[in-house]
From Swiss-Prot:
Catalytic function, reaction form: a (3R)-hydroxyacyl-[ACP] = a (2E)-enoyl-[ACP] + H2O
Cystine crosslinks: none
One cellular component term from this protein's GO annotations in UniProt: membrane
Primary location group: cytoplasm
Top-level lineage group: Bacteria
Protein family (similarity comment): Belongs to the thioester dehydratase family. FabZ subfamily.
Name of the protein in its database record: 3-hydroxyacyl-[acyl-carrier-protein] dehydratase FabZ
Molecular function, one GO term: (3R)-hydroxyacyl-[acyl-carrier-protein] dehydratase activity
Length: 150
């Protein structure tokens, strides 16, 4: 499966997120079980800009981390190109998160996620978000896939 084959319809099949929480617009590069590069077009229409901050809109760091986690989810589910019925992808940890550049409306956020390892059901990823080649955020993410409860 190539990056061009993972269009928005496939993203919507692989991720359970929907507006306003879906934070991946496109897959740019994809190596199954190795790495993924995705794109988030940051627009003033994002609902969080109404309060963060009205006179100086800035993308919240937690939303950048969420976009990275969703990219990691695509990397995990993308290997099989399907999300098992009832399976959800859970964040279980973040290490070393650093925010190095402010992200504004109009920016294109490039999300880079690489598999570091997979042990006992826990995926560990190295992740970074860049704007115009400049690092905005970097972190190590830990995630797991589990059946939804209830």
């Amino acid at each position: 499966m190539t990056a061009s084959e993972i269009d928005i319809r496939k993203i919507l099949k692989l991720l359970p997120h929907r507006y306003p929480i879906l934070l991946v617009d496109r897959v740019l590069e994809f190596e199954p079980q190795k790495r993924i590069k995705t794109l988030k077009n940051v627009t003033i229409n994002e609902p969080y800009f109404m309060g963060h901050f009205p006179d100086q809109p800035v993308m919240p760091g937690v939303m950048i981390l969420e976009a990275l986690a969703q990219s990691a989810g695509l990397l995990t589910f993308g290997a099989d190109m399907e999300r098992k019925e009832g399976a959800l992808y859970y964040f279980v940890g973040i290490d070393g998160a650093r925010f190095k550049r402010v992200v504004y409306p109009g920016d294109q956020l490039h999300l880079n996620v690489t598999v570091e390892r997979y042990i006992r059901g826990i995926w560990k990823f190295k992740a970074s978000a860049t704007v115009d080649g400049e690092v905005a955020c970097e972190a190590e993410l830990m995630c797991t896939v589990k059946q939804a409860e209830g």
